[in-house]
């Protein structure tokens, strides 16, 4: 999804202070031309400023002839999500403006990075067949991480929304921009509202994608939000059937442990799957296949759990849980009641970690801004739902709100959203934004659109598993050519049917992948069954040719065709 753009025009707009004046260094990820990366040195705690930390950032200078003086500054959500990798993507959205991507303090590209592999391993251990003993549980693991960070001199009290917002204000001052346009998504929408309130003279406009207002009881609401998202997708009943079935009889699924680099057999209950789905639905491509996926899981197609479990493991391994929990334990968890235990282990796990860490409760900011604000929400978003985002947006004095038929982080999935954001930033005072279709969710897959099977995902991990298909396609092509040259019609038609089958399957898979690559984790195109008759016809014609004339090419082709059909029907279909 990340689009890299390199522009070659000379910079002609008046210069501002460059990032080289704020501790430049090499960029940790690939960047477009004219991008500088660096660190902003700030106090770890502004109320006790002795210890310093470094906040990572990148600045991509626009090369447009009509370059505007006010850049766009972007921060990802999380907490603890990285931002720099989106620099090129954002530069394409705003070609006439500099783009600044700023990391959160304590995240991967800041120093120190508050990684907690102990916590990630304990959370992954939730899926192991044998429950962890208290000494190996989540709270104990989080405490080991906390103690290790303390030994490094890190004070977790300095990692909260208030300090992160102050870092953004300090970066504008350091880079020398008179004004800039704030762009936040998910958690960082809260940060950007705080920045706008703290630095009104430096803010020209604000974009809030998937708005998470401070007033929301996020943990208390999440089970309801997930149920509402399933209802809007039309699979609330199959979802509950799936959860109940797997809670009664948990599935056993082979999963790769990304931290240890080896497979283990996970025990996945319905609540575990609900937790993983709640995270996965933040991706618009997953949302599009969710109706087919949930319905298949409700019917017992547990082999589809492998890609979900692998994705969950990869997500755990890539997250800085020290920062995540430091923020949540100060700014989010204390403002929820937890009167009802959640079905989601991440919700309960965050409460468990915060009970163990005992960080101080933050003071509510109740920030607002008079700057023009554009708020975007996704209809199927279970994380920052319209139910809470839209009223909060309307409470901002100069805000407008748009709903899109997609999920979380609207701008990543919707070209229309990107157009509207760019139009708003170009003229925040305009009362009318160029219209475009907000129905931007990748086309949802109906039951008839997919032949449910886990085989494509298995092949994506081990391409050699597709060898029978490749062998059949090559053998069919050879059979067609040689039989046609020798005037053997039956064998030639058998080869032609095989080539047609292989070509149609390849074309339909490629078309589906271009439409939504994630769909291949759920199955093959629905036309697969129809095309299979061509493979059967190829085998029948080849067998007839063999019966008519027993030659070794016919024998080989018949063996390959028969073996392929056994593989196709018993494993792939």
Where are the predicted features?
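Long, low-complexity segments enriched in small/aliphatic residues
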Residues: 303-332
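Short loop/turn hinge sites at secondary-structure boundaries
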Residues: 283-284, 293-304, 311, 315, ...
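Structural alpha-beta junctions
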Residues: 299-302, 395-401
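Gly/Pro-rich cap/lid or specificity-loop segments adjacent to the active site
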Residues: 18-263, 267, 326-328, 332-393, ...
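Second-shell loop/turn segments in exported
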Residues: 154-157, 263-264, 276-280, 313-316
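Flexible "cap/lid" loop of the alpha/beta hydrolase fold
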Residues: 212-230, 293-295, 301-313
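Secretory targeting and sorting signals
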Residues: 1-18, 40, 168
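P-loop NTPase catalytic cores that bind/hydrolyze ATP
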Residues: 267-295
């Amino acid at each position: 999804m990340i689009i890299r753009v390199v522009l070659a025009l000379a910079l002609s707009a008046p210069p501002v202070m460059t990032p080289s004046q704020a501790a430049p260094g090499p960029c940790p990820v690939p960047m477009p031309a004219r991008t500088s990366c660096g660190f902003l040195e700030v106090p770890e705690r502004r109320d006790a400023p002795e210890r310093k930390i470094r906040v990572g950032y990148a600045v991509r200078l626009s090369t447009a002839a009509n370059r505007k003086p006010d850049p766009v500054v972007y921060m990802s959500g999380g907490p603890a999500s990285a931002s720099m990798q989106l620099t090129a993507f954002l530069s394409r959205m705003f070609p006439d403006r500099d783009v600044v991507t700023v990391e959160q303090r304590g995240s991967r590209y800041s120093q120190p990075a508050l990684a907690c592999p102990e916590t990630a391993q304990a959370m992954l251990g939730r899926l192991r067949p044998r429950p962890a003993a208290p000494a190996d549980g989540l709270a104990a693991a989080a405490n080991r991480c906390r103690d290790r960070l303390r030994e490094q001199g890190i004070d977790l009290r300095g990692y909260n929304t208030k300090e992160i917002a102050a870092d953004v204000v300090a970066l504008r001052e350091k880079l020398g921009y008179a004004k800039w346009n704030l762009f936040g998504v998910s958690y960082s929408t809260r940060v950007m509202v705080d920045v706008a309130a703290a630095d009104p003279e430096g803010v020209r406009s604000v974009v809030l994608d998937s708005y998470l207002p401070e007033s929301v009881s996020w943990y208390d609401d999440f089970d309801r939000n997930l149920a509402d998202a399933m209802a809007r997708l039309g699979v609330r009943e199959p979802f509950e059937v799936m959860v109940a079935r797997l809670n009664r009889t948990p599935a056993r699924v082979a999963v790769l442990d990304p931290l240890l680099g080896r497979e283990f057999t996970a025990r996945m209950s319905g609540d575990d799957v609900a937790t993983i789905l709640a995270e996965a639905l933040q991706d618009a491509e997953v949302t599009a296949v969710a109706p087919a996926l949930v319905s298949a899981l409700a019917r017992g197609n547990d082999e589809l759990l492998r890609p979900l479990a692998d994705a969950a493991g990869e997500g755990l391994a890539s997250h800085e849980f020290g920062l995540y929990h430091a923020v949540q334990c100060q700014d989010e968890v204390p403002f929820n009641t937890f009167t009802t235990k959640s079905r989601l282990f991440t919700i309960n796990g965050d409460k468990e970690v915060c009970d163990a860490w005992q960080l101080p409760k933050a003071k509510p900011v109740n920030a607002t801004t008079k700057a023009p604000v554009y708020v975007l929400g996704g209809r199927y978003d279970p994380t920052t739902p319209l139910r809470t985002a839209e009223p909060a947006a309307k409470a901002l004095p100069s805000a407008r709100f748009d709903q899109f038929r997609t999920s979380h982080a609207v701008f990543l999935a919707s070209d229309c959203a990107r157009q509207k954001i760019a139009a708003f930033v170009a003229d925040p005072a305009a009362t009318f934004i160029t219209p475009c279709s907000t129905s931007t969710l990748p086309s949802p897959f109906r039951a008839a659109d997919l032949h449910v099977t886990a085989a494509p995902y298995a092949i994506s991990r081990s391409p050699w598993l597709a060898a029978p298909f490749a062998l059949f396609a090559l053998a069919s092509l050879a059979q067609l050519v040689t039989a046609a040259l020798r005037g053997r019609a039956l064998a030639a038609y058998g080869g032609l049917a095989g080539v047609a089958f292989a070509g149609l399957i390849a074309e339909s898979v490629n078309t589906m992948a271009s439409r939504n690559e994630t769909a291949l984790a759920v199955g093959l195109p629905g036309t697969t069954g129809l095309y299979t008759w061509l493979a059967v016809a190829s085998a029948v014609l080849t067998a007839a040719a063999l019966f008519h004339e027993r030659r070794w090419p016919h024998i080989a082709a018949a063996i390959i065709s028969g073996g392929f059909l056994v593989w196709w029907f018993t494993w792939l279909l």
